Structures are given as structure tokens and as C-alpha cells.
């Protein structure tokens, strides 16, 4: 069993969601980073054949610039996460790497559950145009992070950032937004 983090972005999970249709941009995979404390997710469209160096670039551009270096990272045994480059990088940054074990969901079950949910949302959101899923990914990410999660009793934005960003509906219907609070 993994220890529970005490603050946002102290411990994260990383995974790749593959098996998506190739888009006009050539993307067929989503690199997922999930904060284990707030359940906030960062999702980046990419190609399934991405290498460890490119994965680290996405991480630093999409996660580190906003949340800093985590103390620990949980990932599956994808070759991108097993490379010498990847291990050396995190060792230099004093970040502990933990590899999940197949058939032991307690090591990283939340990531797999979130992955299934995101694939389902992407398929629903893009049912008429399945090869444009990467263009809707930012909206799916925002919706996911704004949704109530029973395991934390709130939404990831509130738990991870201390506030919930406004949406167009909040601006268009301010009465509805204040009633929800």
C-alpha cells in the first residue's frame, strides 16, 4: 500500500493511455500525470512511440512549471519509465520512483480508473469525429478537474489549487454558480 501524500503534487502517478485513434496531428496516446493528493490530472496528447527524453520535456513544460518537482512518482513498467535516462533524471532530482506491479491495483489503481474514465469521456465527446480527440483534450481535462470526486469530497481544482476556476457557464449564469457554492 502506498503512503498517502500530505499535500498537493508531493506524489504523482504517470501513465500512458494508448489505443486511441490517430489524429490529424499524428497523436494516438495521452500522457497522464495525476496528483495523488488532489486527484488533479494533467493530460498531454502525444504519439505512442514517444521516447523518455520527450516525455521528460512534456513533464517539465506541463507539470513542473506549475507544481514543482514531486517527491515520488508512481508509474507502470512502460519502457519509457524504465530507461536509464528516466531513472538518472529523477535520481539527480532526488525523486523516488515506484513501479506498479501487474495485478496489484493497490500500487496504482487510481490511475487505471481515471484512464478508463477519460477514454470513456473522450469517446463520448468525440463520437462524431473520433480523430479529433486531441483537440478536445484540454476541455476534457478541465471538466475532469472540476468534477466532484467522492474519494476527496470535492473537486481537484479546489483541493489542489484552493479555488475552482470559472467556466463560461459561471459567467453567463452567475446566479447558478453562487447557488452551487
Regions found by a protein language model. Give the residues of each.
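Short, contiguous acidic/charged loop-to-helix segments that flank catalytic cores in large enzymes
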Residues: 20-22, 45-51, 127-131, 181
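Active-site beta-loop-alpha junctions of metal-dependent nucleic acid enzymes
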Residues: 44-65
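Generic recognition of flexible, low-complexity loop/linker segments
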Residues: 1-2, 16-21, 30, 60-63, ...
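Structured beta-strand/turn binding interfaces of compact recognition modules in eukaryotic regulators
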Residues: 17, 34-36, 46-49, 93, ...
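An active-site-proximal beta-strand-loop segment
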Residues: 6-41
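Short, flexible loop/turn elements at secondary-structure junctions
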Residues: 3-6, 16-18, 38, 48, ...
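Domain-scale segment recognizer with a strong primary affinity
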Residues: 7-11, 40, 56, 69-70, ...
Amino acid at each position: 500500500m502506498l503512503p498517502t501524500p500530505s499535500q498537493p503534487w508531493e506524489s504523482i502517478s504517470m501513465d500512458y493511455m494508448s489505443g486511441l485513434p490517430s489524429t490529424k496531428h499524428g497523436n494516438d496516446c495521452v500522457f497522464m500525470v495525476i496528483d495523488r493528493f488532489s486527484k488533479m490530472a494533467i493530460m498531454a496528447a502525444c504519439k505512442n512511440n514517444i521516447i523518455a527524453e520527450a516525455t521528460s520535456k512534456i513533464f517539465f513544460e506541463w507539470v513542473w512549471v506549475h507544481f514543482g518537482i514531486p517527491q515520488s512518482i508512481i508509474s507502470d513498467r512502460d519502457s519509457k519509465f524504465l530507461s536509464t535516462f528516466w531513472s538518472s533524471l529523477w535520481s539527480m532530482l532526488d525523486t523516488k520512483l515506484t513501479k506498479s506491479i501487474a495485478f496489484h491495483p493497490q500500487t496504482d489503481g487510481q490511475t487505471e480508473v481515471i484512464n478508463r474514465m477519460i477514454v470513456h469521456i473522450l469517446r463520448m465527446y468525440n463520437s462524431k469525429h473520433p480523430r479529433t480527440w486531441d483537440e478536445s483534450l484540454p476541455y476534457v481535462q478541465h471538466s475532469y478537474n472540476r468534477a466532484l470526486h467522492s474519494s476527496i469530497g470535492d473537486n481537484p481544482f479546489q483541493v489542489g489549487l484552493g479555488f475552482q476556476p470559472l467556466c463560461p457557464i459561471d459567467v453567463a449564469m452567475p446566479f447558478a454558480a453562487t447557488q452551487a457554492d
